[in-house]
Amino acid sequence: MAKEIDINKLLAQENNALNTILSQVNELCEQNKKLQGLIEIQNETKELEKEHNRSLPWFKRLVKTVSNVKYIFVKSEEQLTNEAIKYNNKILKDIDNKIYNIAEKSAPLKQELQEEIEKNFKDLTKKDLSKEQRERLSEVYFSYKSKPERFSALNMTNPLQFIKAEELEKQYNSLNATKQNIQNLISENSNIKELKEIQKQVAEIREEIPYTFFEKLNNIWQNVKNVFVNNSEQVLAKNKESNTRAIRKIDEQLYKTKHKFEELIENKERNINDIIAKLPDNEELQKIVSNLANHMTSKKEPILTTSSIAKPLENNVTPPPPLTKNNIPPPPPPPPLSKNNILPPPPPPMPTMAPAQTETLSKPVGVTTTVKKLENQPRPSIDTSDLMREIAGPKNLRKVEKTDVKTQDSRDLLLQSIRGEHKLRKVEFDPNTGKPVAHSHSKPAQNVSKPNGVASILARRVAMEMSDSSSSSGSESDSGNWSDASVNSNKPKALKTRGERDAKTTTHAQKILSNRSSQKPSFVRS
């Protein structure tokens, strides 16, 4: 209730402007009185002039009267000349601007105005009108909802303010009419399911600045045409001709609108450049000029995004290091010695390459053979640490004597085992008590190539032969001097003194030495 009181006060203050609107409506009716229906409207206008109470209901009656005048002009447009049409549109435009200027002063009044215009439009479209007349009426209807001040009052600072707002307003009205034509076309072909989804998208387009409005509407229109092309068999026969005319007309409207936008943008660019040329040079101004140039370039020639540029394939495999001559990798440094400076045993010898393979490697690349390059494959690494240890070798090397395996007998194998430093412990007996004497472990022979070592080996060999002969015959066991001699427990043995045993051993050893003095033993170095 309080809102209506405020609206009534505002209308009372705008009494002169409202009277001017009534006089302009009477003028239109008088100039076009030959058109059917204008006499009734003129009578309604006189009724409004007689009422001095300017209230909200009175304002709604005024808006409805103006809407009826537009309806008659649209319905009877064929009876008017081009000059009459231009004159009528000019007067109607002035009336619309005055009504909007009054409504702008009160938000509740502006809302009431929008609701009343929408209601009148729906009522008028239900009347007997052709398709072209409904399209024309939609253009007139949307002229109610726009005014030049809305575009000239954009949040921009001078001199970037839109000076020719009327041109933008015309494009805005044209786009609204095109939107309505698209909706009418979709409604007439509601049997196509794909168009129902597009119809929702068209209805959801918000009123905004004309150029973005055009972009959204144009994208949706392209989808509509694609639906008609892909579903041509679903189009009813009675709608084919009307659809063709409607599509052609909408295409022409969008083309003209786009061309006009491009012209306005080019003119505005020239105006901005002229204004900038008159200003003093500074860094901020140069940034504005650069941004403007980039913006205009992006509009005319879209720049490819970074995502559209093909990137080179990334290879995370690191290439192997280049090989040295003969394709043999350089050996790594030798491993550090242990605490006791003892190197591990040498590894087995490296496998040798086949002759064919060595010939292939020795030939130059590209002359007689072609070598395929392995890409993105790691080359096999060769561990040469054992090889270096073998080359370095231990500090004290021992000469290894070559022996013929075929000519070796059991005795030679025994001598080799003795050279291998098998530890035999000699047991000595006390001549007084006849008991073994405890000694510390005897050190093994360290150098088998010395002459005194040969005599000791012969003595051990004689002892082993005597032990074997005595154990096989069962007469006696010569195990007095060795700890590992076998004892025959089946026959009793006669105990001998140490002197007898030593004399027998010495005599037997001398016989063997005399027999072999003429030939060189196999274990003595040549």
Curated annotation (Swiss-Prot):
What range does the record give for the signal peptide? none
Protein name according to UniProt: Arp2/3 complex-activating protein rickA
Q: Which residues form the WH2 domain?
A: 383-400, 410-427
Under the heading InterPro entries, the entry gives: WH2_dom (IPR003124)
Cellular component GO terms, alphabetically? cell surface
Cited function: Recruits and activates the Arp2/3 complex, which in turn leads to actin polymerization, promoting Rickettsia motility during infection.
Where are the residues of the annotated region Central and acidic domains? Answer: 448-484
Q: Where is the composition biased (Pro residues)?
A: 318-352
Q: Does the keyword Membrane apply?
A: no
Biased-composition ranges for Polar residues? 481-491, 506-526
Keyword match Repeat: yes
Organism whose genome encodes this protein: Rickettsia felis (strain ATCC VR-1525 / URRWXCal2)
Q: Where in the cell is it found?
A: Cell surface
